[in-house]
UniProtKB/Swiss-Prot annotation:
Organism: Nitratidesulfovibrio vulgaris (strain ATCC 29579 / DSM 644 / CCUG 34227 / NCIMB 8303 / VKM B-1760 / Hildenborough)
Similarity comment text for this entry: Belongs to the QueA family.
Lineage of the organism: Bacteria, Pseudomonadati, Thermodesulfobacteriota, Desulfovibrionia, Desulfovibrionales
Entry keyword set: Cytoplasm, Queuosine biosynthesis, S-adenosyl-L-methionine, Transferase
Keyword Cytoplasm in annotation: yes
Full protein name: S-adenosylmethionine:tRNA ribosyltransferase-isomerase
Record text on subunit structure and interactions: Monomer.
Reaction(s) this enzyme catalyzes, per UniProt: 7-aminomethyl-7-carbaguanosine(34) in tRNA + S-adenosyl-L-methionine = epoxyqueuosine(34) in tRNA + adenine + L-methionine + 2 H(+)
Length: 371
């Protein structure tokens, strides 16, 4: 589907809306799956208020649901400088792409038993950091600053001793979104992961939040009703929370994220398309994988690499027929994606109704089905 974009659709100000602070979910529902679902027919504009547990009642027959199987890494480290000053480091490079260097860095040799890799991350400290500064995060993790970039993004040398995923699980904190105004807790270790998350896909710094609503029971119900499943991988980057800053959104430089689509998933989607069965993206991350690969390659094919696709009104969707998604921040690229799918004015009108009806917004909030 291609939305007939107008000049107003390209203005950043066209994606602003007023959201009361108490509509931003600070915690997950008491139980996984106890979320609300707002169904929007993007052709007629009809809206239905439902429960997410009743998703099967609102999906077309024989739908193929495509979910993101990436897992959130406790990627936020709290440490100190040699002088004792406190520092924070957030690993941005997906864990599977952290490749130990064959030889020690130019700044010195690597101690026996230690590994080192050049990675990207966010650094925060009470006093400015400079190239060459060394930061410690427990006994087995440390970082040396190589180059500082914009908005805190930096290239660093990451030194570790032992198994890296285990070290982050022990020392790290889940990087909850900035609009969740509390520290991460034990409940987040479970509830900020989806039922699709795979251990060998550990490396996202944010959850693919549409997947948070699904339970094993709901998956079984959907399968029993004749729906099918497929998986893709997108390692969600911190750029997902970055606002669009350009007055004309077409000037926005989109952040890139690493994605994977297997030959098996491609074949399942091709068969669904051939049979006339709709492809339902579980979340904007799954949507970005499918549309990003199809746009870059001209067709959907197996792929492992980067995508920086930016979808806004006027974009023609090539793979995705329906979209399950949460409610998104004002002036965000994700709100623009949803507007490309269902129309900006229709989406904003739906958001206003959701606010009036008491829906919970953002990562731990309620969901929409755009069909």
């Amino acid at each position: 589907m291609k939305d007939d974009a107008t000049g107003a659709d390209f203005l950043l100000s066209g994606y602003d809306y007023e959201l009361p602070e108490d509509r931003i979910a600070q915690h997950p529902p008491v139980e996984r799956g106890l979320s609300r679902l707002l169904v929007l027919d993007r052709t007629t504009g009809e809206r239905i208020h439902a429960r997410f547990a009743d998703l099967a009642e609102h999906l077309p027959e024989g739908a193929l649901l495509v979910a993101n199987n990436s897992k959130v890494l406790p990627a936020r480290l709290l440490g100190h400088r040699p002088t004792g000053g406190k520092v924070e480091f957030l690993l941005l490079t997906p864990l599977p792409l952290v490749t130990p260097l064959a030889a020690g860095p130019a700044s010195g040799t690597v101690e026996p038993g230690w590994c080192v890799a050049e990675v990207e991350g966010l650094l925060r400290a009470s006093k400015p950091l400079r190239p060459g500064d060394t930061l410690s995060f427990g006994d087995d993790l440390r970082v040396e600053v190589v180059h500082k970039g914009e908005f805190g993004r930096s290239m660093v040398l990451l030194f570790w001793r032992g198994e890296l995923a285990t070290l982050f699980a022990r020392e790290g904190h889940l990087p909850l979104p900035p609009y969740i105004r509390r520290a991460d807790g034990d409940e987040d270790r479970d509830r900020y992961q989806t039922v699709f998350a795979r251990e060998d896909r550990l490396g996202s710094v944010a959850a693919p939040t549409a997947g948070l609503h699904f339970t094993p029971s709901l998956r079984e119900t959907l399968t029993a009703r004749g729906h099918q499943w497929a998986e893709v991988t997108l390692y969600v980057g911190y750029g997902t929370f970055s606002p669009v800053r350009c007055a004309d959104i077409r000037d926005h430089a989109m952040h890139r994220e690493y994605v994977e689509v297997t030959a098996e998933t491609v074949e399942v989607i091709r068969r669904a398309k051939a049979d006339g069965r709709p492809v339902v993206a579980v979340g904007t991350t799954s949507c970005r994988v499918l549309e990003g690969v199809a746009t870059a390659k001209g067709t959907l094919e197996p792929y492992a690499g980067w995508t920086d696709i930016f979808m806004y009104p006027g974009y023609t969707f090539k793979v995705v027929d329906h979209l399950i998604t949460n409610f998104h921040l004002p002036e965000s690229s994700l709100l623009m994606l949803v507007s490309a799918f269902a129309g900006r004015e229709r989406v904003l009108a739906t958001y206003r109704e959701a606010i009036e009806e008491g829906y919970r917004f953002f990562s731990y909030g309620d969901a929409m089905l755009l069909r």
